[in-house]
């Protein structure tokens, strides 16, 4: 019994010594210098906060003004025990807040503390509820409190179809920046959190300077990228000044019929006949266009089956060039212009579907195209090559769709 009591006494003494020897949760806490002037002039702009954390805990760093209002610099940040001092620079900027009576058309995400005397508090709390707080004083003077305001934020059009069809292919975003900043960014965020950068039109106002700014977005399609999928997105404009203040404005944008258009003349083949004819005869072709993309292809007339005279072009039939439309063309050696004879890539209501007031070839579909040219004048030489092409007007004639399947044709006078 005496031995048992002695052992218990020794155990209790050991536990007491262990408890007494446990280090404080939070120690060696400093903030220096005690006076800062956060105005990006390079002098006393920041204070260094240092502390020793002896056990894992969540850390709060806050500032309280003379009226008892609290401003948050770090909020419940989890940190582990560390032999080295933790250190962080405080630039005078805290989580965004509004001044009494203030109403602004943007969200303030980071803001500098106004001039004044503040009580700083550094609090550590462990998972088992142990909490330690250290406090001190900080004076802020000559702070640059002017916000990098953004006003006049607009997104147009609100519904956007990046598919190079010439209809609502681009979005214009305008804003007015009220202060020179370190960074001005505009981006689109999808539901998965993927950010799509929107470039600025640098011809209007120098980057990051006060004034009117315009951003232009095509979904990346003009650079050969696949645009983001259809859906509703949030557009963000964010400005950050030299002090570190940030403001944010948002709007929504809906993508419809988005996709990179890809189409071909099927198998690179065209039927052309007759290959020998005389003046006043008619030369006719047949080919098939395949839409090999997940987007709709806009087209216009003249429609398949139309006949040209050889001294006409598509303008004569009342269908001028239109940016973004696909048309099949017929060309020949001595033509004075590129693909003077053109036809739509389908028939309205048969191969084509109507979207709004325009006609489109649906995704992953095919259409047979026919057309004729009546030869009404003698060309410069008897033997000529005729070939077909698939034109994406004001965009490109892809190499694979240019000079497709040339046929040698002889034209004679009667």
Task: Give, region by region, the residue ranges found by the protein language model.
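Asparagine-centered strand-capping/turn motif at beta-strand->loop junctions
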Residues: 288-296
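Intrinsically disordered, low-complexity Pro/Gly/Ser/Thr-rich segments with frequent PxxP/GP/PP motifs
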Residues: 337-377
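C-terminal motif of bacterial Sec signal peptides marking the signal peptidase cleavage site
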Residues: 17-19
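Short, hydrophobic/aromatic beta-strand segments
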Residues: 59-63, 73, 183-187, 249, ...
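Terminal connector regions
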Residues: 377-412
């Amino acid at each position: 019994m005496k031995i048992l009591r002695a052992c218990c006494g020794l155990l209790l003494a050991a536990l007491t010594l262990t408890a007494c020897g446990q280090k404080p949760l939070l120690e060696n806490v400093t903030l220096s210098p005690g006076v800062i002037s956060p105005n990006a002039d390079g002098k006393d702009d920041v204070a260094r906060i240092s502390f020793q954390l002896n056990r894992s805990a969540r850390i709060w760093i806050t500032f309280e003004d003379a009226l008892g209002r609290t401003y948050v610099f770090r909020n419940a940040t989890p940190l582990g025990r560390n032999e080295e001092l933790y250190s962080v620079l405080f630039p005078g900027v805290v989580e965004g807040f509004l001044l009494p009576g203030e109403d602004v058309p943007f969200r303030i995400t980071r803001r500098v503390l106004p001039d004044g005397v503040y009580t700083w508090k550094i609090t550590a709390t462990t998972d088992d509820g142990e909490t330690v707080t250290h406090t001190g004083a900080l004076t802020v003077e000559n702070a640059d409190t002017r916000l990098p305001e953004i006003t006049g934020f607009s997104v147009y059009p609100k519904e956007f179809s990046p598919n190079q069809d010439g209809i609502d292919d681009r979005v214009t975003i305008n804003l007015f920046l009220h202060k020179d900043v370190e960074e001005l960014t505009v981006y689109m965020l999808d539901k998965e959190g993927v950010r799509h950068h929107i470039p600025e039109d640098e011809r209007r106002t120098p980057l990051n300077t006060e004034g009117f700014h315009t951003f232009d977005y095509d979904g990346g399609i003009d650079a050969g990228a696949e645009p983001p999928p259809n859906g509703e997105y949030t557009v963000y404009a964010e400005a950050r000044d030299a002090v570190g203040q940030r403001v944010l404005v948002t709007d929504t944008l809906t993508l419809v019929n988005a996709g990179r258009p890809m189409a071909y003349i099927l198998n690179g083949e065209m039927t052309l006949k007759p290959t020998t004819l005389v003046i006043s005869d008619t030369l006719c072709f047949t080919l098939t266009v395949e839409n090999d993309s997940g987007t709709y292809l806009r087209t216009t007339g003249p429609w398949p089956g139309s006949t040209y005279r050889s001294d006409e072009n598509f303008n004569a039939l009342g269908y001028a060039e239109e940016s973004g439309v696909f048309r099949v063309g017929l060309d020949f050696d001595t033509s004075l212009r590129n693909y003077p004879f053109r036809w739509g890539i389908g028939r309205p209501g048969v191969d084509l579907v109507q979207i709004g007031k325009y006609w489109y070839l649906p995704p992953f579909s095919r259409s047979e195209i026919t057309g004729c040219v009546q030869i009404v004048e003698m060309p410069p030489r008897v033997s000529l090559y005729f070939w077909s092409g698939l034109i994406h007007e004001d965009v490109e004639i892809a190499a694979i769709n240019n000079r497709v399947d040339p046929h040698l044709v002889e034209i004679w006078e009667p």
